[in-house]
Each structure stands twice: as C-alpha cells, then as structure tokens.
Amino acid sequence: MASSSKASDSSSQRSKRSDQGTGREAAPASVVPIHGNLTQLIRQIKSRRLLYIKEKLEANRKTLQRHSCSLFDVAAAAEVASRGSDGGNALSQRAAEGQFRLAGSDLAHGIGERDVVYMQEENLASGTLVLSSSGAAAQRTVVRFVKLPLVERIPPYTTWIFLDKNQRMADDQSVVGRRRIYYDPVGNEALICSDSDEEIPEPEEEKHFFTEGEDQLIWRATQEHGLNREVVNVLCQFIDSTPSEIEERSEVLFEKNEKNSGSSDKIERQLSLDKTMDAVLDSFDNLFCRRCLVFDCRLHGCSQNLVFPTEKQPYSFEPDENKKPCGRQCYLRWRGGFQEIHDVGLSGCATYNMESGTVSHKVDVSIMSESEDSNREKGNIRSMTLVGTSGSKIISSVSAEESTTPPSADTSETENASSDMPPSSLRKYKISKRGPRYRERSPGKRQKVFTSDISFASNILNKLSIPEIRDTRLESREPGGDKLQILDESTKKTSSKDICGESPITTTENMGIESKKVSSTKNFLEHTLSCWSALERDLYLKGIEIFGKNSCLIARNLLSGMKTCMEVANYMYNNGAAMAKRPLLNKSISGDFAETEQDYMEQDMVARTRIYRRRGRNRKLKYTWKSAGHPTVRKRIGDGKQWYTQYNPCVCQQMCGKDCPCVENGTCCEKYCGCSKSCKNKFRGCHCAKSQCRSRQCPCFAASRECDPDVCRNCWVSCGDGSLGEPPARGDGYQCGNMKLLLKQQQRILLGRSDVAGWGAFIKNPVNKNDYLGEYTGELISHKEADKRGKIYDRANSSFLFDLNDQYVLDAYRKGDKLKFANHSSNPNCYAKVMLVAGDHRVGIYAKEHIEASEELFYDYRYGPDQAPAWARRPEGSKKDEASVSHHRAHKVAR
C-alpha cells in the first residue's frame, strides 16, 4: 500500500520534472497518444487504489473493534469473579502461604538456622572445607577438595563440508571488494581486514520492485502499443526504473499470463512434438555436463559451450540372425523368416513379378496354418510369393481371425508379366512368419548377396504392410493382436481362379487396375511417413547415431510410447535410411534403396567397438615418444618450472590449425574436443605393456597425466561378468596403476590430534613408496580471490590454499577432505602432485617412503622463507632455505 503510493508519487514527480525542463524537443506524433493513454490509465489506477485503501481501512477498523470488544468482555468477567470471592490480593496471599508452609516444614523436622563457616586460613593448605550448623541437631561436615589434572584445550576446529571432487566457488562467496572480519586471539576482539578503502565498492543501485499498478501499466501499454523503444521510453517517464528492467518485467508478465491462460495438456503435448529435438533439449543442454555425465555439474558449471565431435563413438553391429524379437510388434517377426517353408503345404499363393516397378499377384486365403498362440486348429493363413529378378520366391504368411470373410471363389489372374524379361533372370524370395533365414542358392553365394536380398525383400514387404501399420499398437492390446493383415483390402476382390500351378496371364485392363493400386499404395506410404513429427524424426536420427540400424533399441529407448519397432523399421527402410546418411554421401530420399542399404552395411562392418577390435589380432606398432602427442611445454610443467595451463575443449572441425585454442594455450586436444582423432595436437594415449604405466617410459605418466581407458590402448577397466558385452577380465588380474584418481582408489585416512600443530591426518594401513593416498579437494577460486583469502588465513596461522594451474587455486578451508589436515614438514613422508585426469587438473597425495600404520602424514608446503609459520620453519643454517622460492602468500605448491 505504501509502496504503491510512493511509486505513484515518484512517477508524478518525475513527470513534473520532465515537463518543467527547458529547451525540450517536441515529442514525436506516435508518442503523444501513448503518453495520453498512459496518463489516463494512471489516473484510473490511482482512483482504484484509493478506493481499495478506503475499503481496507474500513475492514480493519471493524476487525479491530470486534477484537477489542472481546478482550473487554473477558476482563469484565474476570473482575466480576474476583469481587464475588473473599477478596484480597491473590498474589500476596499465595506468597504468604508459601512462606508459612516452608517455615512449618523446617520446624517440624527440628532444623534451625544453618550457619556455614569457611575455614580458609586453617585448612587452605590441605584443601578442605568445613560446614557447621547450629540448632537442635548441630552438624559439622568436612569436604575435601580434589585437584583435577590439567587437560589441554581442543585445537580450534573449523566446520567444513566433505567434497569427493573439486567444485567451483559460488558467485556469492567471493571476498573480493568486501571487508573481511577476523577475531584477534590476543585482544579477543573483532577486527576488519582490508588493504585500503579503495577496495570497498560503491553501493549498488537498489533493484526496483514493481507494484501491482505498475504491472498493470506495463501490461496495458505493451498489449495496446507493443514493446518497442518508444513505448519503453514513455514508460520510464511514469515508472522510476531503467528500460532494461521494464523489458524484463514485461517478459515476466507475458510468461505469467501464458501460464494462467489455461492451455490444455493435449495442446502442449502436440506443441512439444512439433518442436525439434534441439528446442526440446534446450534445458538439457544447459544443465547436463558431458564431461562429468551429471546434471548441474559444480565443477564445470551450467550453460557450457556445446562441442559436437566430428567422429562419433562406434556402435556394435549384430546380424539379424542373432537377435531376438523385442515384442509383438517387432519387425523381426516378419523379417526374420527369410526361408523356404518345406513342411507347410501350400494350397494358395500370391505371386509378384518384379521388373521396373510392375507387380502381379494372386491370392488365396484357404490355407490352414499354426497361429502364434499355439492354436493350430484356428485361424486361416494368407500367403504370398514375391518373384524377384533372379528366380527366388518370397512367401509371407499371416494368420487371420476366424471371423474373416470367406474367401471368394474367384482369384485374379496375373495382371502384369514381364514379356521381355527371360525366365532365367527372375529371382524368387520366400518369407515365412517364423524360422531362420534360408536362401535357394549355393552356400558360397549366400553371404555375398545378403545385403541386396534384405533390402529388396524389406522394400516389398514394407509397401504391402503399410495399410495395416497404423493400427498395430491397438491390435497388440487385444487377444488377437498378433494376427496382423498384410494384404490390401483389394485382395479380397480377386478372382476365383487358382493359378498357383498355372502360367501367369496378363491383360491390358488388369495392368491398369494394378497400376492404380500401386499408386494408391505409394500415396499411403508417403502419408504414413509424413505422420512422423519433427521430434520423432530427430529422435530417430539420434538413435541411428547411438544404436546404428537397430529398430528394436531405437523404439525401446528413444521412441517408447510413440512408435513401435515395426513402424521404426518401416520408416528406416523407406525414408529414414536416406535421411540418416551422412552429408558426405549426399543421397536423396528417393535414391536406390539397395545401394543405401549396402552403404550402411559397409559402415556397420567397419565401425566396430573397442570390444571387437581387442578380440581380434593385435598389430605390432612401432612406439615412439611422438605418438603420445603431447607438446614439450608439458615436460617443463612437469619439472615444476611453471604453472599448468587450464584445458578448455576446442570446437575445431577435422584438423586443428594455428588458431586452435588448445594450440595457442599450449595444451593437447583431448577426447572432449571437436577435432578428429587424426588431429596432430590430439593426445593419443599410451601403448604401454604390463606394469609400465607407473614409470617415466609411459607418455601419460611422464606428462603428469593419468591413463584414460578411452584413449590408451591397454589401460582399460573391466567390471562385470561379460553379460552386457564388456570385455572379459584378464586372467592375471592386472590393472593399470596410473588410474587411481580416476577410479578413486584412495587409502583410509584418520583424523586426530597432531603432535606438531592442531589437527593431523593419519594413515590407517601401511603403504609403500609412491602409493596413492588420496586427493586434496576443495573450492576452485581465482588467484585474486586466493590473495584476499590468504591474508585472513595467515592471521589465523593456517593455510588451506593449493596452487592448481594458471587460472585456479584450491581452497579447502570450508570444503575439502581429511587430507587438508596434513601438516607441513621439511622432512615429509608424502608429496603432492598435480595430475591431469579426464581434462581436469587434480591434486593427488602420494607416499614418499614406506609409511607404517597410524603414522601421521606430512608433506612440504613449499613455504617462502618469510611466510612459513614458526612451527614450520627450518632450523637455522639450512642450505635449502636459500633455494626456496618466495611467494605472495602462504600456500601449498605441488611438485
């Protein structure tokens, strides 16, 4: 209420000041009506506001009156009740009764006045106290003092949060530009720590909070005149706010109005399906970290730059013969039966002669067959024979329901026969609903023509099955849902002649009828393919990248509830295969399907996983230091002569040039970069044999890196029993020893009182030399931030800062692990080392020598000669003091 009146007063004063200005230019003609409308709207808002205030005051007055009357009635009733009693002050009466009861109790027990006498002069040395009482029962009590042993105070302990991995500092935790308060242990007072008054920033401008009336003003103005610069400038004259704040507020009001509009869930679902996958996954791209594989990553932050690698991870290829149907609507139930049925008697068939797109067919539905639910007596079967260009047949049998219309006595003649195609060039395929694939060819040629057979049969089968695909999901819920129909309704009207054993007869009239049927089938095919939304198509293409041409996995993982496996397979072999081709192939959707299928088969056979490559015969490669691909700057950094360089993935395509950020910073391109594997700046890992990754011969270890299972050849991790396709565990139980930080294989660390200073870290079990003990974790802060925090830590005689690289410093004061309590020593038993693990610099603590159990851990902080605390300074005359490097603050440095 007060804020609205204040805002209205400020807006009126602002408008008055603007009107009183001299030499002001005339307002444009388009601004005059906006100004007038807003002025009238402000008057209406003020009048409604005044009316609302009056009503609110009246309601509050009535409420206060009722409340006061009720309190007055309660007080009056209490006064009447007190007058009706014996009278007197109740409080004084109760006090007197209490004193009387206490005195009576003492007299009843015979206890008089007790006198306590302290015999300080006589019994001070012996440490005794004598208590005596006078009265009827005089008593004397001697109390002997017990001197307690001196117990040292517990060292100061700062509350901290455990971190299993490093994380960046929150924006509101920065101390730069703020006055820091610390407590002086000597004077026991709070002091302000600040270098100078110049560090104190200017007070920030208060953010404007919009009132309800201002929201109405902004909403009406934007709805009537739109949101442009002129409207915003006019609104600034009535609202004491900046143009950017007004624009942000208008967007908030627009979103709020959209939510309150009450759009149905069905419309929202349809709108989400019409969006592309990039639009739907906008929040996913901002929140998901592709380096840590977690949401809301605290190490790399949100809204990272998306880096799309040019080379995708290969997927495993599995032939259809080894697959199992994923459900009732799986395409393998139709495609998996490419064989000739020798044990089923055929009394009718449908023959399709294929040449230049012409089709001839013949149908008979009087064949009895087994149904999928083991009812051999029920259900009819429809079979068809597809005659190809090399003489083989395709027979597809589908059981129909018992209520199907009885077959007509007439069957159609073959509408179209190939007159100029010799019989020897015809090829026949046979498709059965079940059973392994079989070819009527010699075993030597079977594997050679596998691709073309699959593409040819799938193309024909999908065209025939298109009219029934739309209702497959509904039929699968019914008891007879697995009894699908493949043939078109036009096949019910075929003639009654059975020409299964006769020669085909062609007429011009039937050819025209059949061409219309084929054209209608093609039109329905195009309509079905167009039913795929933009989101479904994008999910399909993403499934091709992840799972390859496996419709079972695509439908199950990406299109669950939207498309069935049969629909995905049909889309794949008609339209999706051409869409999923890489841009380098540059094929159209209407291209040769067999060629498209052949290209994909070749890609599948070449792009195999690391599992398949390792099972094969390993090649003997010549190993050189250059194969590691790390620049010489890494070696200098490994010697501790300069800081490590922060790694940021590059977005280069194919090969990196001189303008690559990684090349400019002197870092290697990692697996997270967008460049290809053949990039000269790419780190290629190591090819070390057994037990060589912990020596200087390993390129990863020499460059202060940990081995990466995705990059290094022989440094891989196995887990499980191999049922999920992972590589089997090695018989000797060998595991790379340069992946301790990555796998978090740290030792057990205990926390206790240190004999040196404060708290200390102790090892629970004995360890050997160079064994990995644990990771030094904390907040990632900038060097400027570390300088400000270090001044406070120096006054508290503690140091939790650790130099990491040229951009970040680790601070374990508030967040970290137990190794933050490891003290400094000039003769340490541990050492710290910065390692590059999966593109991130991390600090590992390693044993410098053999350490027994329960022994305290020490490592050299590398203090400067003038910055080490008193307990951490070396004895006088030490030669190593001259070689130590002076730093700006007391901090820890890895070697």
UniProtKB/Swiss-Prot annotation:
The gene is EZ3. It is an enzyme of class 2 (transferase). Residues 1-13 have a biased composition (Low complexity). Belongs to the class V-like SAM-binding methyltransferase superfamily. Histone-lysine methyltransferase family. EZ subfamily. This is Histone-lysine N-methyltransferase EZ3. GO terms for molecular function: chromatin binding; histone H3K27 methyltransferase activity; histone H3K27 trimethyltransferase activity. Its EC number is 2.1.1.356. SUPFAM superfamilies: SET domain. Residues 1-30, 396-446, 870-895 are annotated as: Disordered. Residues 873-885 have a biased composition (Basic and acidic residues). It holds the Pfam family SET. Residues 396-422 have a biased composition (Polar residues). Polycomb group (PcG) protein. Catalytic subunit of some PcG multiprotein complex, which methylates 'Lys-27' of histone H3, leading to transcriptional repression of the affected target genes. PcG proteins are not required to initiate repression, but to maintain it during later stages of development. Widely expressed. Its main location: nucleus. One of its GO terms (biological process) is heterochromatin formation. Residues 747-862 form the SET domain.
